[in-house]
Swiss-Prot record:
Gene Ontology MF, one: 5S rRNA binding
Pfam families cross-referenced by the UniProt entry: Ribosomal_L18p (PF00861)
Keywords, comma-separated and alphabetical: Ribonucleoprotein, Ribosomal protein, RNA-binding, rRNA-binding
Organism from which the protein derives: Methylobacterium sp. (strain 4-46)
NCBIfam families assigned: L18_bact
Cited PANTHER family: 39S RIBOSOMAL PROTEIN L18, MITOCHONDRIAL (PTHR12899), LARGE RIBOSOMAL SUBUNIT PROTEIN UL18M (PTHR12899:SF3)
CDD domains assigned: Ribosomal_L18_L5e (cd00432)
Name the record gives this protein: Large ribosomal subunit protein uL18
Endpoints of the signal sequence: none
Assembly behavior: Part of the 50S ribosomal subunit; part of the 5S rRNA/L5/L18/L25 subcomplex. Contacts the 5S and 23S rRNAs.
Gene Ontology, cellular component aspect: cytosolic large ribosomal subunit
Amino acid sequence: MSRKIDLLDRRRARVRRALRAAANGRPRLSVFRSSKQIYVQVIDDASGRTLAAASSLDKDLRARLKTGADKAAALEVGKLVAERAKAAGVTKVIFDRSGYLYHGRVKALADAAREGGLEF
């Protein structure tokens, strides 16, 4: 199991290094995916602040969602974070998939955030 975690950490570091080079001052849309929930934050790395955040545990979403671990939950979280980011004055971000494959829940969240008005 530790080998899997080590490989994930290496992938995550490689993705973040590439993002830092390509960011050009844009905030980072960072995704964390657990087995039961999905979380996303818009982070300004220059100041070290979180500008907007959403997760499948938000009270607004919890009542509507059957579970936080499917694509439907990721779609709702993506829409919600886009709405909150736009309210905070952020429209252009760089997508940090945190070493996860761009497939399934991560892809659904990214597509919903794009539909919500975020550009990346």
